């Protein structure tokens, strides 16, 4: 991807009926390639302005998936755009840290849309 994403970025992606939000928790470079660690939010938005307004009060957003680990191919299969960057706090990273401590870590090669059950 041509954009230089970083931890704390809020990303917007389009689905048929509107827009969804993701947040970059971390980006790992491994021998097998890049692994994207994301959180996904429940809220869907009819337009970008509504999503932008929600990000301004992001503590009111609800998280549907606190941690998703995706291959680079899976991440790049859904077009996203950066909306804003906000520093992450320990609570944001809790599920990611638990994943790191887990012996049998799984990284998905499914797109964000498929993982979230969206089209």
Roles of regions detected by a PLM:
Residues 6-10:
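Loop/turn positions that initiate beta-strands
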Residues 18-28:
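Short beta-strand-centered aromatic/proline hotspots
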Residues 27-52:
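Basic/aromatic-rich interaction segments and small domains that mediate binding to polyanionic partners
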Residues 44-119:
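Intrinsically disordered, low-complexity, charged/polar segments
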């Amino acid at each position: 991807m041509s954009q230089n994403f970083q931890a704390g970025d809020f990303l917007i992606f389009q689905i048929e009926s509107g827009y969804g939000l993701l947040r970059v928790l971390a980006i790992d470079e491994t021998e097998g390639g890049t692994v994207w660690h994301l959180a996904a939010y429940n809220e869907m938005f009819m337009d970008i302005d509504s999503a932008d307004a929600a990000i301004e009060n992001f503590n009111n957003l609800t998280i549907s998936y606190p941690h998703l680990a995706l291959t680079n191919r899976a991440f790049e299969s859904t077009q996203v755009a950066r909306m804003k960057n906000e520093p992450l706090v320990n609570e944001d990273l809790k599920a990611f840290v638990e994943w790191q401590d887990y012996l049998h870590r799984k990284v998905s090669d499914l797109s964000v849309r498929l993982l979230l059950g969206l089209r």
